[in-house]
Amino acid sequence: MTDTFFKASRMGKVVYPVTEMLDEAYLLEPPEFEGHWDPHVWNDINAWSKAAEAVLLAFCEQDPDHCDRYKENAKAYQKRLELLDKYVHKTMASIPKEKRILITAHDAFNYFGRAYDVEGVGIQGLTTESEAGIEDIN
């Protein structure tokens, strides 16, 4: 993903890698990708709300004439995210903790697991470039 950002930047595109705009204490760094943040922050609604603030700042920087409108939209969006977060917490609480296991092909739900107390198992790992074997599923 970093390469994509660099290429776009070299082509004159404005690039704002959202995870780099968030507080590092909030981000997850997978051991197999030391030095790189897990980019799947949208799977934690609170993290995505923080990302919306980062996007708001980027929009206001690029288009200051419409900053007030961006702020209104961000505030409304964050309110919807807050309601969604409450719903997910309530729904997840209805599942016994020992049964909260999310098995996926691609290990993209670490933020979701942390936010909602769910064990995530990605049989392919964090990247879609690896292959899952039968031993990973058993």
Place the predicted regions along the sequence by residue.
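Extracytoplasmic metal-acquisition and chelation regions
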Residues: 1-138
